[in-house]
């Protein structure tokens, strides 16, 4: 059945695989295939043989829709040209508008502006000249406008990328909110044609202000007042919440004192000034203000430490006195503990806050224990372990 090339006459046809490189699966079934002339095999699909691959006949008739324009009347032809031009104009307009609006998503629009202005309205950055001379890809020319001016957008146009409140409202992502006015969105100047009548004042805009259906409305009696252009979250009424006053929120009002933005005012706190320092320490976070409780205890430990020094000075002359000197140190350490125990009842119990503030408890009120009569401490010499 299967015919192999005479070089591969072993009982296992693929035993010598190095000699039989040209043997293929097709060659084992059809003997008329020449193994040594592989290029003579032609793919019927590649040649396009009609017997192997038939395709339906292509009808090369004239397409009627292409030639239809010639047979149209002049009016229809004019309409077709007008619609085509309108589509091109609309496409070009959308490109230019997206180019003009690119400044809104720029990072400079989110900056709060110069430091002297505390309002969070539209910042006084350089606004673009909305002329058509700047191509869509290039950087838009900037020009300053007046301090109280507001940018008013025309209706229509493409979506704008950006998280600025005006951008999001222009895209229609959030519903307009009443800011400082009885009705209407936060900005409403949808001017769709030149010399359009402003909706609020009814006055006609001049040709200089209206340019490419985009308008800068100044605050001199025309159009939108600058209060209307603020982003949604900022309302400048006089009744302002305390946590809006500073960026740290209500942090300073924890103790009832209106010290905005300051963390802790221990000395000037008018409400809870009567409480002792142990109460202050309990209110603080860990590691904050705990030194106030340790201070009196440290001053009571000092006479106990002065008792340790003569004990060390007695150790210096001879090493045999180390052990009795260490036994003298132990009662000195035991005197530290009652010194700390004396300090705890010395705190005042929390009283009701009075209007007059008493001075805080100082170290002078604590009765210092009498120093035991010891020889005066000598000037510091070498330590006893250095003399060994």
Curated annotation (Swiss-Prot):
Residues 233-251 have a biased composition (Basic residues). Keywords: Coiled coil. Residues 162-388 are annotated as: Disordered. It holds the Pfam family DUF5892. Residues 265-279, 293-346 have a biased composition (Low complexity). It comes from the Viruses. Residues 166-176, 196-208 have a biased composition (Basic and acidic residues). InterPro entries: DUF5892 (IPR045411). Residues 68-96 form a coiled coil. This is Uncharacterized protein 89R. It comes from Frog virus 3 (isolate Goorha) (FV-3).
């Amino acid at each position: 059945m299967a015919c192999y090339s005479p070089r591969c006459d072993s009982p296992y046809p693929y035993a010598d695989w190095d000699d039989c490189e040209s043997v293929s699966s097709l060659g084992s079934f059809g003997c008329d295939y020449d193994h040594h002339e592989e290029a003579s095999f032609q793919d019927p699909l590649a040649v396009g043989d009609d017997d192997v691959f038939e395709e339906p006949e292509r009808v090369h008739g004239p397409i009627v829709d292409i030639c239809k324009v010639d047979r149209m009347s002049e009016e229809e032809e004019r309409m077709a040209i007008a619609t085509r031009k309108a589509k091109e104009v609309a496409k070009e307009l959308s490109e230019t508008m997206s180019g003009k609006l690119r400044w809104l998503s720029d990072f400079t629009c989110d900056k709060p502006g110069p430091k002297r202005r505390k309002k969070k309205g539209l910042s006084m950055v350089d606004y673009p000249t909305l002329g058509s001379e700047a191509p869509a890809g290039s950087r838009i020319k900037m020009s300053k406008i007046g301090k109280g001016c507001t940018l008013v957008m025309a209706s229509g146009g493409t979506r704008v990328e950006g998280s600025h409140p005006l951008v999001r409202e222009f895209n229609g992502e959030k519903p307009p909110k009443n800011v400082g006015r009885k009705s209407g969105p936060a900005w409403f100047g949808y001017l769709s044609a030149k010399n359009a009548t402003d909706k609020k004042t009814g006055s006609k805009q001049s040709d200089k202000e209206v340019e490419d259906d985009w308008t800068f409305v100044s605050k001199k009696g025309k159009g939108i007042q600058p209060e209307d252009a603020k982003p949604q979250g900022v309302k400048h009424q006089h009744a302002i919440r305390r946590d809006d006053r500073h960026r740290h929120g209500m942090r300073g009002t924890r103790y009832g004192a209106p010290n905005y933005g300051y963390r802790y005012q221990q000395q000037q706190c008018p409400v809870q000034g009567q409480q002792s320092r142990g109460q202050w320490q309990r209110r603080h976070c860990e590691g904050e203000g705990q030194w106030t409780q340790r201070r009196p205890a440290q001053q009571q430990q000092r006479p106990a430490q002065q008792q340790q020094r003569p004990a060390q000075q007695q150790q210096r002359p001879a090493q045999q006195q180390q052990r009795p000197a260490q036994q003298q140190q132990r009662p000195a350490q035991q005197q530290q503990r009652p010194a700390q125990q004396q300090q705890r009842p010395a705190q005042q119990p929390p009283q009701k806050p009075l209007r007059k503030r008493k001075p805080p408890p100082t170290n002078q009120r604590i009765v210092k224990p009498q120093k035991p009569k010891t020889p005066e401490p000598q000037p510091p010499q070498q330590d006893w372990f250095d003399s060994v």
